[in-house]
């Protein structure tokens, strides 16, 4: 009865248009008040526990780092470097946009931020060179999802907090899948470009390539600092996020000098707004997850699945279906916090590696970001291009098939996610 009330109330509130965060919090709070022996105080305690979770402290720092990198002109230099590397190939500007998304993803940890930073520059450049606007918008919208797969990743931080999994291992596990997805997108773009006879830029000289690499160096160094620092043990992922924020501010203000000190309050305010919005969603989702845990739903489902005799591949198929459906209607962090505690104990029973499960969930969240009606990347792409939302959806959906094929690869070939952590002795 309790669980039926919880989920029916959640779906009812979402159906009548109540914001997702409020729906999660309200359904969880009413369930506790009406059916649980817990006191009203537990509501406040659970909500405030979010703000003191050490792992989640990485989120505002990564958001701040991405804000400084975007405002400070790092994205433009990364795009110039990507164009210098692959622009001479047929379809090179589109391939360069994917490469730029991969590079910026390694700095920001956010898919919408990656789309906004790269799309605002790369799509306009493609249109000027004769590419259809819809082609460029579809590519950047999909490639921008790499922002939560290539480390650092805010969604990975949330999964780690929900399941008590190592953030460092998740970051390392995301490297190979992120590079593989980027490579697959590039190959498909090249094939399409050959068929459609899309233009190529003149090959740059070695001097020009070195000049673009030198300008992008300070941005590229941040990737080495984050991953190198975590793997070497110099600092934890949360400390790495703080280092990234300070480093990004230093580069934007004193190295590239694309920002003035007077612009810092605006950057801090914008990243603060994003942090508050995301943490409000996370706090309410954690309250909802608390109700699930109190009612022992994950344990009950795990026992039921074990009794059914589901094989690991069948369970992972169910996981993907549930996550793909949820991704159409909910924000990634909320999905992770609600469903990860349910799937996690079942995966442990079936011998599925928690890191592998985490990467599968992240890839599903990538797909959710580009599927209507609430795919955030679609709205960001529409905003930076000026295209109607319907046209943006039509531009992005053909590329969605690539992500679905990639999801199958990641799901049923665990080595894609686990090979690098195992090789580095992090298993």
Swiss-Prot record:
Keyword Ligase assigned: no
InterPro entries in the record: DctM, TRAP_DctM
Keywords per UniProt: Cell inner membrane, Cell membrane, Membrane, Transmembrane, Transmembrane helix, Transport
Induction per the UniProt record: Expression is maximal in early exponential growth phase and declines with cell density to reach a plateau in the stationary growth phase. Induced by the C(4)-dicarboxylates succinate, fumarate and malate. Positively regulated by RpoN and the DctB/DctD two-component system. Negatively regulated by DctA.
Transmembrane segments: 2-22, 55-75, 91-111, 115-135, 138-158, 171-191, 216-236, 237-257, 274-294, 310-330, 335-355, 359-379, 396-416
Range of residues in the leader sequence: none
GO cellular component term, pick one: plasma membrane
UniProt-listed Pfam families: DctM
Topological category with respect to the lipid bilayer: Multi-pass membrane protein
Top-level division of the source organism's lineage: Bacteria
GO biological process terms, semicolon-separated: C4-dicarboxylate transport
Effect of disrupting the coding gene: The dctA-dctPQM double mutant shows no growth on malate and fumarate and residual growth on succinate.
Molecular function via GO: transmembrane transporter activity
Main location: membrane
Subcellular location: Cell inner membrane
Family, similarity comment: Belongs to the TRAP transporter large permease family.
Subunit structure and binding partners: The complex comprises the extracytoplasmic solute receptor protein DctP, and the two transmembrane proteins DctQ and DctM.
PANTHER family given in the database record: C4-DICARBOXYLATE TRAP TRANSPORTER LARGE PERMEASE PROTEIN DCTM, SIALIC ACID TRAP TRANSPORTER PERMEASE PROTEIN SIAT-RELATED
Function: Part of the tripartite ATP-independent periplasmic (TRAP) transport system DctPQM involved in C4-dicarboxylates uptake.
Family annotation (NCBIfam families): dctM (TIGR00786)
Misc note: The DctPQM carrier is more efficient than the DctA carrier for the utilization of succinate at micromolar concentrations, whereas DctA is the major transporter at millimolar concentrations.
Protein name in the entry: C4-dicarboxylate TRAP transporter large permease protein DctM
Organism: Pseudomonas aeruginosa (strain ATCC 15692 / DSM 22644 / CIP 104116 / JCM 14847 / LMG 12228 / 1C / PRS 101 / PAO1)
Lineage, opening ranks: Bacteria, Pseudomonadati, Pseudomonadota, Gammaproteobacteria, Pseudomonadales
């Amino acid at each position: 009865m309790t669980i039926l009330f919880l989920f029916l109330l959640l779906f009812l509130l979402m159906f009548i248009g109540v914001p997702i965060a409020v729906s999660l919090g309200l359904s969880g709070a009413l369930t506790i008040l009406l059916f649980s022996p817990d006191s009203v105080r537990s509501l406040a305690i659970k909500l405030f526990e979010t703000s003191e979770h050490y792992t989640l402290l990485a989120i505002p720092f990564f958001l701040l780092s991405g804000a400084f990198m975007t405002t400070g002109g790092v994205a433009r230099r990364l795009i110039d470097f990507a164009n210098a590397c692959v622009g001479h190939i047929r379809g090179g500007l589109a391939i360069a946009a994917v490469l730029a998304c991969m590079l910026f993803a390694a700095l920001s940890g956010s898919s919408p931020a990656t789309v906004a930073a790269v799309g605002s520059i790369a799509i306009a450049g493609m249109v000027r060179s004769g590419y259809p606007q819809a082609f460029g918008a579809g590519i950047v919208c999909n490639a921008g999802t790499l922002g939560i797969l290539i480390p650092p990743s805010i969604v990975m931080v949330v999964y780690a907090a929900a399941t008590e999994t190592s953030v460092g291992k998740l970051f390392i596990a995301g490297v190979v899948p992120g590079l593989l997805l980027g490579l697959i997108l590039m190959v498909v773009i090249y094939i399409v470009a050959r068929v459609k006879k899309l233009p190529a830029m003149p090959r740059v000289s070695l001097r020009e390539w070195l000049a673009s690499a030198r300008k992008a160096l300070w941005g590229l160094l941040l990737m080495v600092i984050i991953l190198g620092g975590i793997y070497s043990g110099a600092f934890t992922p949360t400390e790495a996020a703080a280092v990234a924020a300070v480093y990004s501010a230093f580069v934007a203000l004193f190295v590239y000098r694309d920002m003035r000190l007077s612009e810092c309050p605006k950057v801090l305010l914008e990243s603060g707004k994003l942090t508050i919005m995301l943490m409000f969603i996370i706090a309410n989702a954690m309250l909802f997850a608390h109700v699930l845990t109190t009612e022992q739903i994950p344990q009950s489902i795990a026992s039921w699945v074990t009794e059914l005799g589901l094989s690991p591949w069948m369970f992972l198929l169910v996981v993907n279906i549930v996550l793909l459906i949820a991704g159409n209607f909910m924000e990634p962090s909320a999905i992770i916090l609600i469903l990860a505690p349910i799937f996690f104990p079942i995966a442990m029973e079936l011998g599925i590696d928690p890191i592998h499960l985490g990467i599968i969930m992240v890839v599903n969240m990538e797909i959710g970001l580009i599927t209507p009606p609430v795919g955030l990347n679609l709205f960001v792409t529409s905003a930076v291009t000026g295209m109607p939302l319907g046209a943006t959806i039509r531009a992005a959906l053909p590329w969605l098939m690539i992500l679905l094929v990639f999801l199958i690869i990641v799901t049923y070939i665990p080595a894609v996610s686990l090979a690098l952590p195992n090789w580095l002795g992090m298993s």
